[in-house]
Regions:
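Multi-pass membrane proteins that catalyze or facilitate reactions on polyprenyl-/lipid-phosphate substrates
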Residues: 1-266
Length: 266
């Protein structure tokens, strides 16, 4: 699961869509409460990969002639990340309800296919992007991308998929929106992971030594794989568009529907 998380969290192909298939193929001997928490908490490893890879762009302090200086451009970037996170805070109370009612084959397949089609439509517009650098992103852009990010509350949507589609429609270049999407993950995924751990602890549940080891290994694997996935996507979008991911999502959605039909008939 750490490998799947590390790859699918950053590519716009829906980690949930892959997880729901993986859970069908591989039967995990763990409680539903632990698995629910595990799926979210291993994202911490993925987030750490972003911090490590982009540390120079994310740390707002530097040294000049032996003195600590502040970097206004980095602070501006963080303020825009915060602006994009605000819409998520508004809808976050619905997260558990959405997972309980819509974490199923049909919803996941529908979102996979829908956003697959959206990627193809958006890329076929032949529109010329006017936002090529992160410092050209306005607070309005950031807030609207945050609204798109809210759609990821629906299982199968893909957080990166929603924000990339939104960013492309707003006129961001592929490389710019991909990088901004990585940064948005830091507060959103870290907050979601910590909230899941807190809820798990308050429920009175306790992890066994084996479960703790599995969680740690999952985070480490997610970190290592994420390093490669992020590098791959940043290099890929410099030379290609997102049509491949659109087709991939549609095919995966059809596979999920087929698995749902087979499961229902079994």
């Amino acid at each position: 699961m750490g490998i799947v998380e590390g790859i699918t969290e950053w590519l716009p192909i829906s980690s949930t869509g892959h997880m729901i298939l993986l859970e069908q193929i591989v039967k995990f001997n763990a409680s539903e409460e632990f698995m629910c928490m595990f799926r979210v908490v291993i994202q911490l490893g993925a987030i750490l990969a972003v911090v490590v890879l982009f540390w120079g762009k994310l740390w707002p302090f530097g040294l000049r002639q032996g003195r600590v200086i502040s970097k206004p451009s980095v602070w501006s970037l963080w303020f825009k990340v915060v602006a994009a996170t605000l819409p998520v805070l508004v809808i976050s109370p619905l997260d558990d309800w959405m997972e309980a009612h819509f974490y199923n084959y049909i919803t996941v397949a529908a979102m996979l296919i829908l956003y697959g089609v959206l990627f193809l439509v958006v890329e076929n517009r032949r529109a010329t992007p006017h936002v090529m650098r992160l410092d050209q992103i306005t607070y309005r852009d950031a807030l609207l991308i945050g609204v798109w990010q809210c759609l990821a509350i629906i299982p199968g949507t893909s957080r990166s998929g929603a924000t990339i589609v939104g960013g492309l429609l707003l006129g961001l270049s592929r490389a710019c929106v991909a990088e901004f999407t990585f940064y948005l993950a830091i507060p959103v995924m870290a907050g979601a992971s910590l909230l899941k751990v807190l809820k798990f602890a308050l429920s009175g549940a306790a992890m066994t030594g084996t479960e703790i080891a599995v969680l740690v290994v999952g985070c480490v694997v997610a970190f290592a794989v994420s390093m490669g996935a992020i590098r791959f996507l940043m290099d890929y979008v410099k030379r290609h568009n997102f049509k491949f991911f659109g087709v991939y999502r549609i095919v995966l959605g059809l596979i999920v529907l087929a698995v749902a039909a087979i499961t229902a008939l079994a």
